[in-house]
């Protein structure tokens, strides 16, 4: 369906296939504009896109790939042993990113401003994956933890918290809204 052979892919009723998470999200925001997940004003939209890019590129490379890729995917796919230097780097980088999330939410209600946006959803998706393997040091990043608790408590996010990977259960706090 996707010439690049990647997910996600959204297939519309007429058979049109859209690929790429940002493309799909912006398409859905255009088709279902209320409430907007990108933002209404150009600067707000730009800030949302900047943060989506931050998490999908920078956070993904510096944290998600180093922790989930090394600790989980290598084991799950029986590829090789985790590279401990990569895992250590992922843990160190995680603190930097949680500090940045804390910085943002100490100044704004949500990551990109006063409204929940795709930036919050993107960041929460990455963090949820890492939280599933128990590698988010929430206790030393209270503002980020409070922001994530608000995301976790949203009805639209809760189904994600009940997903489990066979033979790899999440830590007890994973689905707890008051972690």
Positions of PLM-derived features:
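GST-like domain detector, emphasizing the conserved glutathione-binding G-site
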Residues: 1-88, 102, 178
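Short secondary-structure boundary/hinge segments and terminal tails
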Residues: 28-29, 148, 168-170
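Extended, non-catalytic scaffold segments that flank or surround catalytic motifs
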Residues: 32, 142-143, 171
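A general structural signal marking secondary-structure boundaries and capping sites
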Residues: 32, 105-108, 155, 164
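Short, hydrophobic secondary-structure boundary micro-motifs
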Residues: 35-40, 62-63, 111-114, 139, ...
């Amino acid at each position: 369906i996707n010439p690049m052979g990647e997910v996600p892919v959204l297939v519309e009723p007429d058979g049109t296939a859209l690929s790429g998470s940002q493309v799909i999200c912006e398409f859905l925001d255009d088709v279902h504009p209320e409430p907007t997940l990108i933002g209404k004003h150009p600067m707000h939209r730009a800030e949302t896109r900047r943060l989506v890019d931050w998490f999908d590129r920078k956070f993904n490379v510096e944290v998600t790939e180093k922790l989930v890729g090394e600790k989980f995917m290598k084991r799950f796919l029986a590829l090789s042993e985790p590279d401990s230097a990569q895992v250590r780097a992922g843990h160190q980088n995680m603190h930097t990113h949680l500090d940045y999330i804390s910085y943002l939410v100490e100044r704004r209600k949500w990551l990109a401003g006063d409204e929940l946006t795709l930036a919050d959803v993107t960041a929460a998706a990455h963090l949820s994956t890492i939280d599933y393997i128990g590698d988010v040091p929430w206790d030393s990043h209270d503002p980020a933890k409070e922001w994530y608790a608000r995301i976790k408590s949203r009805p639209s996010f809760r189904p994600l918290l009940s997903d489990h990977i066979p033979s790899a259960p999440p830590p007890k706090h994973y689905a707890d809204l008051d972690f």
